[in-house]
């Protein structure tokens, strides 16, 4: 459920969020079928909006949370879900890599998670600070899957889902 507003206590402390507000017009006014959101208050409030989080930006500005911090860093993350042959599956196995096939001038890494039902999640994240205009993160992901250890896991399997998104890397 998306959150549309941050709630502050009288003393200025972060108190909660408004969630589940639906039916606003493009200009922000209530439209036909408008449903107000529900206030959710908590002792702790976690904002997990991703790289374009408008509520997080508001909170960062209000409390000056970016003072003395590095500039934000971003990456592009790609993930595929595979159904693999049982003999290629090891439920619970986790593999993280870094570097290859990107080379020394670029940074990124991969993950391979063996979940239940012969499902394997394969993902690759490339930092968006690369200088080579010809670097194509999607093709680097394809190269990664041809590594002998990864290809062996995926051999005879079937990709059943995929996606990509921008990810925060620090800052």
Model-derived regions, located:
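Predominantly flavin-linked oxidoreductase catalytic cores and closely associated redox partners
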Residues: 1-152
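A glycine-rich dinucleotide-binding beta-alpha-beta segment and adjacent secondary-structure elements
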Residues: 153-171
């Amino acid at each position: 459920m998306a959150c549309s507003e941050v709630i502050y206590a009288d003393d200025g402390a972060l108190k909660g969020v408004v969630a589940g507000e639906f039916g606003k017009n493009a200009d922000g006014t209530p439209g036909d079928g408008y449903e107000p959101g529900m206030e959710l208050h908590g002792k702790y409030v976690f904002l997990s909006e991703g790289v374009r989080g408008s509520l997080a930006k508001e909170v960062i500005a209000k409390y000056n949370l970016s003072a003395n911090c590095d500039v934000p860093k971003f990456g592009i993350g790609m993930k595929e879900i595979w159904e693999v042959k049982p003999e290629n599956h090891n439920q619970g196995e986790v593999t993280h890599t870094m570097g290859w096939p990107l080379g020394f001038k670029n940074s990124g890494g991969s993950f391979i998670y063996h979940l239940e039902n012969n499902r394997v999640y394969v993902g690759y994240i490339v930092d968006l600070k690369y200088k080579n205009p010809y670097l194509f993160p999607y093709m680097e992901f394809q190269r990664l899957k041809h590594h002998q250890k990864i290809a062996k896991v995926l051999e005879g399997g079937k990709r059943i889902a995929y996606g990509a998104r921008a990810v925060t890397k620090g800052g």
